[in-house]
Amino acid sequence: MSVEIFDLLKIAHEEGKRTRIFNTERLHAWVHVYPKTGDKDDMHCHNADQTFCVLEGECTMHFPDGGKAVLGPGMVATIQGGSFYQLENTGTIPMVLMGNRSGPQDAIKHINYETRKDIKHYFRDGPLRVTEETKEFFRQKKPD
């Protein structure tokens, strides 16, 4: 059995972005950094179950029905595959999360809420940040 030990906050502060720390056929894990207040991803879901644990900062999870949940350090969210959500840094410091998801990273889909399409290939180098440009891009990609 192989065991690796990681200093997640050190990785987060040195890399400053989403960094995979583990990837097998059964599970993958990563550290996710949202540096600025207001940084958020798109409303989306994945095709696998997952968890997020807040290590630093404040994370607000938004849901399609307008609901939300605020998580602080040490709090964990479990998300069933197919459940739509959006993560946002609503704190005053960088938001650092550790996430893990069942299955290998390459098998995971990132389904956008508006288009209902897998958009994983649009952001290979880190999480998709919601900007006016990305909003316009997805408005144009809506299915007929």
Q: Model regions: which residues?
A:
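Short acidic-glycine-tyrosine-enriched beta hairpin
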Residues: D65-G81
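Short, conserved beta-strand element in jelly-roll/cupin
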Residues: V33-P35, C45-M61, N100-S102
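A short, N-terminal "cap"/entry segment at the start of jelly-roll beta-barrel domains
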Residues: M1-V31, K40-D42, N112-D144
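Ligand-binding loop in jelly-roll beta-barrel domains
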Residues: P73, G81-I108
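A short beta-loop-beta micro-motif enriched in histidine and acidic residues
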Residues: F22-L27, T37-C53, D65
